[in-house]
Design a protein with these regions (language model features):
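Disordered, acidic Ser/Thr/Pro-rich linker "stalks" and the adjacent N-terminal cap
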Residues: 118-178, 191-198, 275, 800
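Pan-zinc metallopeptidase signature
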Residues: 276-336, 645-769
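Beta-strand-enriched, solvent-exposed domains that form extended recognition/catalytic surfaces
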Residues: 279-440, 782-855
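A short beta-strand micro-motif common to beta-rich folds, especially ectodomain repeats
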Residues: 92-104
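Trp- and acidic/polar-enriched beta-sheet ligand-binding modules for extracellular glycan
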Residues: 169-170, 195-274
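Extended extracellular/luminal ectodomain segments enriched in beta-structured repeat modules
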Residues: 168-170, 178-187, 241-242, 360-366
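Catalytic cores of extracellular degradative/oxidative enzymes
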Residues: 451-454, 461-666, 690, 694
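Surface-exposed binding patches on compact interaction domains or structured appendages
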Residues: 34, 52-84
Length: 859
């Protein structure tokens, strides 16, 4: 034994010597080269620590190693080798190797390196899922029975009936244990396929004890029809002797206008592991485990059984543990389904509130500690917005420690949506040893310097830009390439959503609850900009304008257009208007935010759309359809003129806000998808309803304007507008509407209202007319078949009309038609009127706001 000990000491001493010292032991004799590493199978911890391989050699050697993304190899001056490994987020171990070769190439020695798999889940000390569970449902769609919620596969799910035999609420799902169990909590996982149908609303949860037929109420709660997995607590200490648990589902989500469905991807029941709970109480001061008790030493930590708590304890003892994003407080939000139903919008608001600034890797095992959760369930949403992948998964969270295996990589969000959002407490969450990516937040006063620092240190693919009203998620690589001023870019999205909410009356009528609107990135195959329940979706290849910091390049109209799709409200939307009434928002936001003075409707194509509206719409008595020149922007103009006259002039700035509120709070005529029946009037009734409500809200008789602009014209046509439905308005419906308004004895708006735009609106505000004493021909320049008329020569003009010798109206010309504006100089100084000899024009009149006319040119 003594000889073996002495030999070991000698070898150890040799290995600690540098190569030069070892050569002296050879007595100057020439020996065969040797390289002796202390191990040829090195093991590195998953935590990303470094390791040293001692090397004894009698020759110079080099290290041959193929570089990779997790292992760095360095030879030290004393001849030893240092191994530096990144953190291993995966359950599986990973291997590498390196070759030690003498300089003359005559001798080689291979060393294998293994990094341990991530053991942070602490498999022996995780919570226990109860087995031996069966289920019974009072109704189910064929092939979607309750067993699908117990098979451990979120891709399969229980679903209540649809089709010819619809769901009848309540839907009752009963889960029975083979033997009575202690239950601490349950986890309800909604379907994870991107379809919200069947997500739970109001649910009564009951349990039955062994040997009893009595059902005891646990809670009656609203899950908010959200997609996040939810933890259902059975009390602080759990409940013993439970034999059955029953869910009586009273409401659920449906996207087809039906009464709803019920579905469930997985239902699990759990018992809390007491070993982990005891270690949290023994070693840490607080429930979030952010501070060790004063008496805790490294020797004590060695004996901890929960691997993640042990690693955390070491990090806290080292004194360099960052909690910037790992430990945060999160608020509750109104469920997006409830908000949609209240606001009657077309799509839901942000479904990934509460960014954490933590990024996750696929297969990573993580620990999340929660404190402060009361009656409502929360979950961790991990979502990747590309460009490498686009996936989302949810993980239910409970108070205490939650050990999770992450399915897809992405950024983390705390899903905390509850009907009780106004009174629900904030919850505190600790992502133990989480990988910090950070997020930019206008509400925290972040500057562009903060933005640049976040980009420089980003660890994930995507970065969240958070404002008070909007939340953007863009690829880091795109922001690095395009965004010189992240604060400015984030502020533009926040301002767009602010002005849209202002126009919708959410501020005036106290319906802004803090829920943001989302702007996200989708795959290249996503086509063009579009909107859905995820918000404003921007394909990866189309990110240049939305992420720019150049005010002349930023796409105000396009972003407001897609966010406006989300905000399109029943009553301000019927067939033919899907790409129209959202642009009320675009025009409003463009006017408020675009600093170079450009206005799309007035300036694009030198005012051609207005000209088309007047000559092919008003003059030809067209119906209100996108078929006017095949241009939805032409159909937009009368809605825009109502906005300009009320809000733009400041005469009635609350008209549109009050209109939206009326549509939210009254019985708007219902529409039926795909209905092309001769007897279907739903969309036509909506159009009539809009006219009535506008007149009542403004206390003004707009019936003449609505007749001129085609709102009150008989129509009976099938219209294709993402759906095909019939727009059917009879003369009787029109007469009833006109009689309804006339009976109110409201005053009428100015007769020249069809000419109003943003450049001539002050004449309507100030009620000023064109002077009658200006000499005919003043400021008029003939050039070929056109007459250019200078506005300065005809003050207060709002438009022009051209007549032939017999007094027939040939043309209506909008203010500024033909004016070629330029950056910061878009307000027109002249109008170009057609003077085609083939039409025998005789004179042009300057039109005032009240419809009166003064001849300004004649031949």
């Amino acid at each position: 034994m003594k000889l073996k000990y002495l030999y070991s000491v000698a070898v150890a001493t040799l290995l600690c010597l540098p190569a030069q010292a070892q050569l002296k032991l050879d007595g100057g004799e020439t020996k065969a080269p040797y390289i002796i590493p202390s191990t040829d199978s090195a093991v590195v911890a998953y935590t990303g620590d470094y390791s040293t391989i001692h090397v004894a050699s009698n020759c110079e050697y080099n290290i041959q190693h193929v570089a990779n993304d997790w292992l760095t190899v360095r030879r030290e001056k004393n001849g030893n080798i240092s191994l530096f490994a990144t953190y291993n987020y995966l359950v599986a171990a990973r291997q590498d190797s390196l070759m030690l070769a003498s300089s003359d190439g005559k001798y080689e020695r291979k060393v294998y390196v293994t990094q341990s798999g991530n053991t942070m889940s602490g498999p022996l000390y995780a919570d226990v899922k109860i087995s031996g569970v069966s289920g019974v449902a009072n109704q189910a769609q064929g092939g979607y029975d309750i067993s699908k919620s117990l098979d451990g596969n979120v891709a399969t799910f229980y679903h209540s009936p649809w089709g010819s035999t619809p769901t009848t609420f309540p839907v009752i799902l009963t889960y029975n244990f083979n033997t009575a169990q202690h239950v601490d909590y349950a986890i309800y996982t909604p379907r994870q396929d991107g379809n919200n149908n069947g997500n739970w609303g109001q649910v009564l949860i009951e349990y039955r004890l062994e040997g009893s037929n009595e059902w005891i109420t646990l809670k009656d709660t609203n899950f908010g029809m959200g997609s996040g997995a939810a933890s259902i607590s059975f009390g602080e200490t759990g409940i013993d002797n439970v034999k059955s648990v029953r869910y009586t589902i009273k409401s659920g989500y449906a996207d087809d206008g039906s009464n709803g469905f019920a579905s469930c991807a997985e239902m699990g029941f759990y018992q809390i592991n007491t070993v982990t709970a005891n270690e949290m109480n023994t070693f840490f001061v607080d429930k979030l485990c952010t501070q060790l008790k004063p008496n805790v030493t490294r020797d004590m930590v060695v004996g901890m059984k929960n691997e993640v708590l042990k690693r955390l304890a070491y990090a806290l003892l080292d004194g360099n543990y960052s909690t910037d994003y790992r430990v945060s407080e999160y608020r509750a939000y109104k469920p997006v389904g409830e908000l949609l139903n209240e606001l009657k919008t077309s799509y839901t608001y942000n479904n990934h509130e509460n960014p954490t600034g933590i990024t996750f890797e696929k297969g990573e095992r993580v620990a999340v500690i929660v404190d402060g959760l009361e009656n409502d369930g929360i979950s961790l949403q991990v979502r990747n917005f590309g460009p490498s992948e686009y996936n989302t998964n949810w993980y239910a969270l409970k108070n205490g420690i939650n050990v999770l295996t992450i399915i897809n990589k992405g950024n983390g969000y705390i899903d905390y949506y509850t009907s009780n959002f106004q009174h629900a407490p904030n919850v505190n969450v600790h992502f133990v040893l989480g990988k910090q990516n950070g997020y930019f937040d206008l509400t925290k006063g972040h500057t562009n310097n903060d933005f640049m620092e976040l980009l420089a240190n980003a660890t994930g693919e995507d970065l969240d830009l958070v404002g008070q009203y909007a939340q953007c998620v863009f690829p880091v690589e795109t922001l690095r390439a395009n965004t010189a001023d992240g604060r400015w870019t984030a502020l533009q999205f926040d301002s767009i959503t602010y002005y849209e909410r202002q126009l919708m009356g959410l501020f005036k009528h106290n319906r802004d609850y803090g829920n943001r609107q989302a702007i996200i990135t989708v795959p290249k195959s996503g086509g063009l900009y579009h909107a859905n329940n995820d918000g404003c979706c921007i394909p990866f290849q189309a990110l240049a304008q939305p992420t720019t910091s150049d005010p002349n390049y930023f796409d105000y109209w396009g972003m407001a257009h897609e966010l406006g799709h989300v905000n399109q409200t029943a009553g301000v939307l019927w067939i033919g208007l899907t790409e129209v009434t959202n642009n009320i928002m675009s025009a409003y936001c463009e006017h408020k935010l675009k600093k170079n003075g450009f206005h799309r409707l007035e300036n694009e194509s030198q005012g051609f759309r207005y000209y088309n509206y007047l000559n092919n719409g008003i003059m030809k008595e067209a119906k209100l359809l996108p078929s006017v020149g095949g241009d939805v922007f032409v159909t937009l103009i009368p809605f825009y003129q109502l906005l300009t006259y009320t809000e733009g002039t400041g005469l009635q700035p609350d008209a549109y806000p009050d209109l939206y509120e009326t549509m939210r709070t009254t019985n708007v005529p219902a529409i039926q998808r795909g209905n092309t029946s001769e007897n279907y009037y739903g969309d036509g009734q909506r159009q009539i309803y809009f006219c009535k409500q506008w007149c009542d809200i403004t206390q003004t008789d707009y019936t003449d304007f609505f007749i001129q602009t085609g709102f009150l014209k008989p129509v009976n046509e099938d219209i294709g507008d993402y759906d095909t439905r019939r727009l059917h308005i009879t003369q009787d419906m029109i007469d009833e509407c006109i009689n309804y308004v006339k009976a109110k004895n409201y005053p009428t708006p100015p007769a020249g209202l069809v000419f109003i735009d943003t450049y001539n609106k002050n004449a309507f505000r100030d009620k000023v007319t064109v002077p009658a004493n200006i000499a005919i021909g003043t400021g008029c320049i003939k050039s070929g078949s056109n007459i250019q008329i200078q506005h300065a020569s005809w003050p207060n003009v709002v438009g022009f009309k051209t007549y032939d010798a017999t007094g027939n109206l040939i043309h209506m010309t909008n203010y500024g038609h033909g004016y070629a504006g330029s950056n910061n100089h878009y307000e027109p100084t002249y109008t170009v009127c057609a003077w085609n000899s083939a039409e025998s024009p005789a004179r042009i009149t300057a039109v005032s706001y009240d419809g009166s006319e003064v001849t300004c040119y004649q031949e």
